[in-house]
Amino acid sequence: MKAILFSLLIGSSITTFAQSTDYVSQVWVADQGDGTYRNPVLYADYSDPDAIRVGDDFYLTSSSFGCLPGLQILHSKDLVNWQIVSAAIPYSLAPHTDTAPQHGNRVWAPCIRHHDGEFYIFWGDPDQGAFMTKAKDVKGPWSEPVLVKAGKGIIDTTPLWDEDGRVYMAHAYAGSRAGLKSVIAVCELNADATRAITQSRIIFDGHEAHETCEGPKFYKRNGYYYIFHPAGGVPTGWQVVQRSKNIYGPYEWRTVMAQGKSSVNGPHQGAWVDTANGEDWFLHFQDVGAAGRLVHLQPMKWVNDWPVIGVDEDGDGCGEPVLTYKKPAVAKQPICTPQESDEFNSNELGLQWQWNANIDEKWYFCNKEQGVLRLYSAPVTDDYKNLWDVPNMLLQKFPAPTFTATMKLKFNPIGKYYGERTGLVIMGMDYAGLMIENTEKGLVLSRTECKKADKGSAETVNKTVKLSSNEVYLRARIVTTGKKIKESEGGHDLVVECKLSYSKDGKKFKEIGETFQVKEGKWIGAKVGTFCTRPNIKSNDGGWVDIDWFRITK
């Protein structure tokens, strides 16, 4: 059991500090403490971000795809310091009978809005259509999602409440499902925004000038309807803004931000927000490959009713992204960051954690009394190939370009049969980990990896160690090298490497196996976390692993 004060292992040294409400990362802080910030303001995979201001508070959500809890919501007072405060989809996504992971499916490009005292989040499910959930309090409870408009390929939905009381929704199409992409459409919704009452009308075709236009965000200002959207592809694109006096067009457009001479490739979709004192800002993502899609904050200004995003040094109306800038002019706020480390001293899972699929309540027990998280071994399916297929993977986003993840665990398998496993995993379409398995020879620690896990490949083991104790410390060291990946794999992404090690006493760690090149997941960045499984054999119970703590350090 751990007290509120705890000792943090960093290599072989010990640092003691107290837990506080405002978590501050050891590995990435955007606020520089001198009135400036550095980008990314969120060095984590908050893909397709959208944000709003309500009073003096800012809220951000992002694509969660098939990960649960879904639609994590972050809160900030200054657009720089963010913490996770809730999730709009706490347990499962429709169809709720799904038990398998839905990699890259389900929740695409949400849009968060506040209207008439309620928070709304719209999103597209590429296989079902446009959904909406709402709540009076951003911390919930959130309503059961409503299918607003059914249709294959409807994605990137964004509502707009007009001054006359009518409600509209703009959206894009996923070519993989709809057979059409690079267009943006608008339909009208009923007054309570729960149902489309007209067919969608295509209002912009980007095939010639702005191919792969997607991710629209709908706004109205000074009598103009504005649609902000990216084009040109995720890693290589640019920001476009359209405007019209008529909601159905015709729209005129401008490119308002592009990479230019900056190092920020393909500044992609995001959100315009203003401060209470009238400053304008734009949050968007940058795809960096293995770590995912990172969130940047750009200054924004209006010139002749056109937005200019970033810094426009040549005055052509198209800005470039900044890497450092002065913070928004709001009241000074304490430095904080999204939660990472977890001492498991609560009766609820930390908001930084997500499972790989709809959540089964039998997977875990938050044992506050003992200060541990207990994961019960869940049986794999008969057609199990590798961990890509496992729903009870408990994972969190990479928090920085370079960091160390360490966990302390105690494995308690059922001795009468073999094959129960747990461990520390760096998860993506390729993955690697330290797996502890109950075998005929006792507990064995394996340095395991799986290339092309998403294609059903089998795991390989490059080193094993017999364990004399069921209590062990596992560690992953993640380093972004500065090198670029091969041109055949995209060329623009930075190489991220992982070294794995273990310890019997938490002081001396021994590296095991080879260096692993980290690979992203399906539309998401790589993640780090754990699991507990057993073979699919008939049994009325299984073993478990008690995780004492999980810590992110330098």
PLM ranges: what are they?
Residues 19-554:
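Carbohydrate-active catalytic/glycan-binding domains of CAZyme proteins
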